[in-house]
């Protein structure tokens, strides 16, 4: 049986207890701010009621008030982190002891971001650097017109300007400045090795200036230093160098692969090479395949690569296209056979896919341009069947044109598997007889010089085959 007892406490003791309860907790507990990061800020026109701070093995969700204000403390290791508000993101450098206040207007996110407090200089530098990168980036069309030497010159100029910007920022954090300098070098080498410059370099066709420059930079890198290859930029260079070099059968690269790197790093390179067995790499796919065969022999993992390689080769121009027969939003079946006699431009997409939705305005523009031509525009949704209502609603809300149909089993649908579709949006062009014209056709929109525009390549391909 539970009972309540009356307890007598003398008046002096009661007063003492009352005083103890009213003393601030901070007297008994002092937080060591040198071991944490204090982060606060004000977001104008917030996109969400939360922001995310992400890094290697770290994630923190911070609440944003209705006024756009936030405040929190973080226990982090020194390094680069991502600041993300569900729509926009930026890089932020954090280390224990930093006390940063951030102001942003999401309507001009990159242009307005500003840091005040301990740690402001490295982060204001990053904000200005990313604006510099955006301003000096070149689009695909401009890149295609450049020779390897012109692209090399452009990259070197940007690299040197980046170093100047870093020096002018008067960074008071030597560790950050050193790592940023290292980052610029790896960024530059990744860009060069992964471009037409790298192809000419590994094939022995580059100019003496390019050859000497890359030889000097690459030979100065200690590939046995595993600690060197920890950042995303150094890893990107590492994979680019070995992928391009091994595919080109470069002796120096092969020697480094066999003698200077560990088994885990080799697995990463193999993974990078596997990505080359793809529609996105038609020109060099055979070379990637032969490289993997040489490195892996006939083990089980290579047999899977071989199967995929043979399947992709079966989807070359002129071969019969895999077929589809799926219902439209009213339930009426639409098949490839029913569209014979027309060019068929297929868009495989989903309502949850941001890059897919970014193509919609340009797809509609393309449809309007070819409205009087014998071209069928077919959009195949690979949403889950349970989301069919959402799909139908988007058709109405976005005023989607063309033929809108829904695959029967999302990613596992036969058409999707037959075309080895591993990422969307994916566009396919089929001729009037049901044969493949392009298993990975140009998208309606191309990104050039910071903007999307109707893609000349798909218009040219359609015109050539009408």
State where each predicted segment sits.
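N-terminal targeting signals for export/organelle localization
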Residues: 176, 248-320
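Thiol-/selenol-based redox modules, centered on thioredoxin-like
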Residues: 429-466
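A non-transmembrane, solvent-exposed segment enriched in polar/low-complexity residues
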Residues: 32-179, 187-204
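Short, internal strand/loop/helix patches
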Residues: 327, 392-426, 432
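Bacterial Sec-dependent N-terminal signal peptides
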Residues: 1-36, 461-466
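Conserved redox-active cysteine motifs that mediate thiol-disulfide chemistry
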Residues: 340-341, 347-365, 379
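Amphipathic alpha-helical repeat scaffolds of TPR domains
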Residues: 179-197, 226-240, 262-276
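N-terminal "domain-start" segment that seeds a small globular fold
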Residues: 303-336, 401-403, 456-464
